[in-house]
Amino acid sequence: WLVTIPITLFFAYIQPVIIEPLFNDFSSIENKELEQKILALAEEADIPANRVYEVKMADQTNAMNAYVSGIGKNTQIVLWDTTLANLSEEEILFVMAHEMGHYAHKDIYKDLTIDFVISFFVYWFIAKLMKNIIQKNGQVLNIKRIEAIHSLPLYLLISSILFFAISPLSTAISRHQEIKADNYAIELVEEEGAGISTFQALAKSNLNEANPPLIVKWFRY
């Protein structure tokens, strides 16, 4: 568990500048007027970025996306070309203001902290449960000790069940962050109408269910 902390932080730091460009075609956004408007919003949100990047995704998907990624000086503002092609300027600015809300609220650091804490207790519980199961049923399961490779299927079974069971907690935290980011965007761009039309367009392009059943919402949204 301790080993995952520096590794996760390292990849979060290098992801925007090294990992993401390996798999996608990044370039500076062509619409410089729009870029200046986005950077003006970024300045209000104290985001240390001086460029906006466009990613070519139209050949791969019809979905739209935009995000602010990275930590510290490696922070980047990114828009998919599908977003630029299918949303109006007001809608694009709302999307970016929403993503900047996550940055302003330091959600990436909160998410990392929450993930580390939850994973610590989950893995601790898994270790305790596996030891108990192996002590009582190790002969039947053909597992002599927890370190044995034969214990891997048992670990995968238990961990998948546990992480699924606690997923409503993760989605609840995510929904809370999304609501705060929405409110931040409304205050930043002062345009609620753009927010409504943006969500409708995103739901349509990303094939999201507008009103999922409550149980689905708890586990997936």
Where are the regions a protein language model picked out?
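Polar-ligand-bearing catalytic/cofactor-coordination segments
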Residues: 1-146, 156, 160-221
